[in-house]
Swiss-Prot record:
GO cellular component, as recorded: cytoplasm; cytosol; extracellular exosome; outer dense fiber
Comment on protein domains: Consists of three domains, a large central CORE domain and two small peripheral domains, NMPbind and LID, which undergo movements during catalysis. The LID domain closes over the site of phosphoryl transfer upon ATP binding. Assembling and dissambling the active center during each catalytic cycle provides an effective means to prevent ATP hydrolysis.
Name this polypeptide is given: Adenylate kinase isoenzyme 1
Modified residues (N-acetylmethionine): M1
CDD domains in the cross-refs: ADK
Quaternary state and interactors: Monomer.
Gene3D superfamilies: P-loop containing nucleotide triphosphate hydrolases
Pfam entry (one): ADK
Listed SUPFAM superfamilies: P-loop containing nucleoside triphosphate hydrolases
Localization annotation: Cytoplasm
The protein's role, per its UniProt record: Catalyzes the reversible transfer of the terminal phosphate group between ATP and AMP. Also displays broad nucleoside diphosphate kinase activity. Plays an important role in cellular energy homeostasis and in adenine nucleotide metabolism. Also catalyzes at a very low rate the synthesis of thiamine triphosphate (ThTP) from thiamine diphosphate (ThDP) and ADP.
Length: 194
């Protein structure tokens, strides 16, 4: 299992809340057969399970704080091990949020092949999130929480991008345009991996 994980393509997908990274991940799954693992989805399903861990996570998320690293890594690892035999690769969505998370991931799981940076401006992200909040029922899609989430995101993510840029594995896509125009940029980067 360990060896298989180390040989598998692992792509970190980083982008702010509302950047459209989730949508891009869905399209990558359809076209390339990767497995999409969103730390947010893993956490939310844990919360809705009503487990003790889920209740703790719920309190943390409602305050707009980040969930402990150990918890996230355990959940990611379990999900990857479950799929390693059938997947063409993994999209790790919303991770790492800080350099230490990336280093810990590499120690415990494997090295990323690429970091895909889905980059949209704060106004665009806010508008998309407010629109999503009308229909999603998510506790964290309101204006005040969005502002906090964006601040948290920028503060945490800039050092991560810088860290992986030194290794030459960051690929940035401009996420201001339509879903398809963003995806064509994504495909250019993924096709280069083959």
């Amino acid at each position: 299992m360990e060896e298989k994980l180390k040989k598998t393509k692992i792509i970190f997908v980083v982008g702010g809340p509302g950047s459209g990274k989730g949508t891009q991940c869905e399209k990558i799954v359809q076209k390339y057969g990767y497995t999409h693992l969103s730390t947010g989805d893993l956490l939310r399903s844990e919360v809705s399970s009503g487990s003790a861990r889920g209740k703790k996570l719920s309190e943390i998320m409602e305050k707009g704080q980040l969930v402990p690293l150990e918890t996230v890594l355990d959940m990611l690892r379990d999900a990857m091990v479950a799929k390693v035999n059938t997947s063409k690769g993994f999209l790790i969505d919303g991770y790492p949020r800080e350099v230490q998370q990336g280093e810990e991931f590499e120690r415990r799981i494997g090295q990323p092949t690429l970091l895909l940076y889905v980059d949209a401006g704060p106004e665009t992200m806010t508008q998309r999130l407010l629109k999503r909040g009308e229909t999603s029922g998510r506790v964290d899609d309101n204006e005040e929480t969005i502002k906090k989430r964006l601040e948290t995101y920028y503060k945490a993510t800039e050092p991560v991008i810088a860290f992986y840029e030194k290794r030459g594995i960051v690929r940035k896509v401009n996420a201001e345009g339509s879903v398809d125009s963003v995806f064509s940029q994504v495909c250019t980067h993924l096709d280069a991996l083959k």
